[in-house]
C-alpha cells in the first residue's frame, strides 16, 4: 500500500502540484486476515472491487483477489511477500552458484514488476537451489512466485468477470 503525499512545485511558469507515493511496509497482522473475495459491487453498488493481495498461510503464497476492503489487503505482491514471507526465494537475489560448461536459460522473479524474466547464465550442475531466486523454467518461476488469482463471482449474472 502506498500513502499519497502532495508536493507543490514553484517554477518560473507558475505553480503546479503532483501526487507521489511513499512505499510503506504493511502491518504483519494483515498476513492473518482471511482472504474473502467480493461477490459483486462494493457497498454503494457503484464501485467495483479493487484487485489487491492477501496472504494464504497454508500455501505461504500471496493471492490476488477482488476486495472492497482496501485497508485489509496489500497493494502489491511484493509488499505481501515482504511482509508475510520475507524468506521467500522470490525475494532473494538470483543464484550465482557453481557452474559447469555451457550456457542455459533460467528464470528469475522480478518482485517490483511481478513477472518472471529469462536470463542467460552458465549452466548449473543439474538443478537450481530451492532457496535462491533462479528457476529452471518460466512455469516453475510462475508457480512459485506469481500470485494466484481468486475470481469475483457476479451473483446477478452467474459469471466471473475480469
UniProtKB/Swiss-Prot annotation:
Domain BPTI/Kunitz inhibitor residue range list: 90-145
Regulation: Zn(2+) modulates binding to host coagulation factor XII (F12) and high molecular weight kininogen (KNG1).
Keywords: Blood coagulation cascade inhibiting toxin, Disulfide bond, Glycoprotein, Hemostasis impairing toxin, Protease inhibitor, Secreted, Serine protease inhibitor, Signal, Toxin
Domain of life: Eukaryota
Tissue expression profile of the protein: Salivary gland.
Binding partners and assembly: Interacts with host coagulation factor XII (F12) (inactive and activated) (via fibronectin type II domain). Interacts with host high molecular weight kininogen (KNG1) (via amino acids 421-466 and 459-513).
Role played: Anticoagulant protein. Inhibits activation of host plasma kallikrein-kinin system by interfering with reciprocal activation between coagulation factor XII (F12) and prekallikrein (KLKB1) without affecting their amidolytic activities.
Protein's name according to its UniProt entry: Haemaphysalin
Organism in which the protein naturally occurs: Haemaphysalis longicornis
Amino acid at each position: 500500500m502506498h500513502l499519497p503525499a502532495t508536493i507543490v512545485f514553484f517554477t518560473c511558469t507558475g505553480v503546479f502540484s503532483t501526487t507521489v507515493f511513499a512505499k510503506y511496509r504493511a502491518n504483519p497482522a494483515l498476513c492473518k486476515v482471511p482472504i474473502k473475495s467480493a461477490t459483486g459491487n462494493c457497498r454503494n453498488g457503484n464501485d467495483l472491487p479493487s484487485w489487491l493481495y492477501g496472504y494464504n498461510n497454508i500455501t505461504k503464497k500471496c493471492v490476488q483477489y477482488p476486495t472492497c476492503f482496501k485497508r485489509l489487503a496489500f497493494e502489491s505482491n511484493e509488499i505481501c511477500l515482504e511482509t508475510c514471507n520475507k524468506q521467500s526465494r522470490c525475494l532473494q537475489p538470483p543464484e550465482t552458484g557453481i557452474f559447469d560448461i555451457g550456457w542455459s536459460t533460467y528464470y528469475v522473479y522480478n518482485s517490483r514488476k511481478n513477472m518472471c524474466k529469462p536470463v542467460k547464465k552458465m549452466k548449473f550442475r543439474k538443478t537450481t537451489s530451492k532457496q535462491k531466486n533462479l528457476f529452471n523454467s518460466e512455469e516453475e518461476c510462475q508457480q512459485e512466485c506469481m500470485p494466484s488469482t481468486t475470481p469475483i463471482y457476479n451473483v446477478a449474472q452467474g459469471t466471473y468477470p475480469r
